[in-house]
C-alpha cells in the first residue's frame, strides 16, 4: 500500500506514529535499513507509515472483514513505504536487517478470514428438496416428442424442409411429401367399395382365336372351354365371360335369337326339299306353252 494514500488518512496520529516507530526500532535492536534498495522517504514519512500500518493492523484485528482472496496478504514490515511485495517471507527484502520476527511483532498481520461457504449444489438457486415433493406432483418420465429441433421445425412447416442454403441443390423440395402427421383423411386415396376388378384386355391373337371359336360354336362345352383357356393362356372364367359378351353383342346387332352356327340345315332325306327341287328343275327344263 502506498504511503501517499496512507499518510493523509492517518495524519492526525502523528504522536502515536512517532511512539510506534521508536518502539519498533527498540524491539528490532537496530535500525531497519534495506540493503539493496532505498525507499527515498524522509524519516518522518517512514515513521508515519509504520505507525499507520500498525494502527491499520490493530483496527483490522478489531473489525475483521471478508477478503476477496482466500489467502490474505500480510502487511509489509514497518520502516519502508516503498511498496515491497506482500507475503509471509518478508526477510528477503531486508537481508541486512535484524530478525524479521521483531518487525512482525510491531505490525501484526490481520487474522485469516473464515473460508467462504461452499456454493449450493443447485447452481446458486436454493433447492427445496425433490421436485416431486416441492411442486406436489409425481415426477413423470416424459419422452420428448421430437429428438432434435430440426425435426420439430419440419413438422411445423412441412413445406420448408430445406434451408435457404441448399434450396438451389434441391429444386424439388416443394414436391416432397409431408410428414404423416399432416396427412388428412381427404388426402388419402379413396378405395372403390366392393371387390371390383379392372377391365380385361385381350391381345389380337386371343381375340382372333375366340372369334373363330364363336363362329364355329357360340356355346362351349366344359371340355372345350378348358382346351381354349390352356391354348390362349386365359382362365376358364375369362373365356366364359367373353363368350357371354359376344353372344349379347351378336343378338343386339342382328336382332335375332338364332346364331349362324345354329341355323336349321336341310337333311339329306327330306322329301319336301326333294320335291321342291324337282319342281324347280321341271319348271326350268319344260318351257310353258
Curated annotation (Swiss-Prot):
GO terms for biological process: anterior/posterior pattern specification; negative regulation of transcription by RNA polymerase II; skeletal system morphogenesis. InterPro entries: Antp_homeobox_TF (IPR050948), HD (IPR001356), HD_metazoa (IPR020479), Homeobox_Antennapedia_CS (IPR001827), Homeobox_CS (IPR017970), Homeodomain-like_sf (IPR009057). A motif (Antp-type hexapeptide) lies at residues 183-188. GO terms for cellular component: nucleus. Residues 107-122 have a biased composition (Pro residues). Pfam families: Homeodomain. Keywords: Developmental protein, DNA-binding, Homeobox, Nucleus, Transcription, Transcription regulation. Signal peptide: none annotated. Belongs to the Antp homeobox family. This is Homeobox protein Hox-D8. It comes from Mus musculus (Mouse). The gene is Hoxd8.
Amino acid at each position: 500500500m502506498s504511503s501517499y494514500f496512507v499518510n493523509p488518512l492517518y495524519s492526525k496520529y502523528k504522536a502515536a506514529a512517532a511512539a510506534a516507530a521508536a518502539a519498533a526500532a527498540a524491539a528490532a535492536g537496530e535500525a531497519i535499513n534495506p540493503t539493496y534498495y532505498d525507499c527515498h522517504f524522509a524519516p518522518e514519512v517512514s515513521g508515519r507509515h509504520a505507525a499507520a500500518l500498525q494502527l491499520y493492523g490493530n483496527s483490522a484485528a478489531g473489525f475483521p472483514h471478508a477478503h476477496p482472496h482466500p489467502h490474505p496478504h500480510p502487511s509489509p514490515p514497518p520502516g519502508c513505504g516503498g511498496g515491497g511485495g506482500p507475503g509471509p517471507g518478508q526477510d528477503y527484502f531486508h537481508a541486512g536487517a535484524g530478525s524479521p520476527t521483531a518487525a512482525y511483532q510491531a505490525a501484526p498481520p490481520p487474522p485469516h478470514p473464515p473460508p467462504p461457504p461452499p456454493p449450493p449444489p443447485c447452481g446458486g438457486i436454493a433447492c427445496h428438496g425433490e421436485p416431486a415433493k416441492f411442486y406436489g406432483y409425481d415426477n413423470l418420465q416424459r419422452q420428448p416428442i421430437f429428438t432434435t429441433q430440426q425435426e420439430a421445425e419440419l413438422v411445423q412447416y412441412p413445406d420448408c424442409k430445406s434451408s435457404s442454403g441448399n434450396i438451389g441443390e434441391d429444386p424439388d423440395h416443394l414436391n416432397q411429401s409431408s410428414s404423416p402427421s399432416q396427412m388428412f383423411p381427404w388426402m388419402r386415396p379413396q378405395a372403390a367399395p366392393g371387390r371390383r376388378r379392372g377391365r380385361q384386355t385381350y391381345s389380337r391373337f386371343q381375340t382372333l382365336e375366340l372369334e373363330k371359336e364363336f363362329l364355329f360354336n357360340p356355346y362351349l362345352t366344359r371340355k372345350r372351354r378348358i382346351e381354349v383357356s390352356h391354348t390362349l393362356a386365359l382362365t376358364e372364367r375369362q373365356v366364359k365371360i367373353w363368350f357371354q359378351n359376344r353372344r349379347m353383342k351378336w343378338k343386339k346387332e342382328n336382332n335375332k335369337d338364332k346364331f349362324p352356327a345354329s341355323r336349321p340345315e336341310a337333311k339329306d332325306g327330306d322329301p319336301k326339299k326333294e320335291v321342291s327341287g324337282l319342281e324347280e328343275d321341271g319348271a326350268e327344263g319344260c318351257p310353258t306353252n
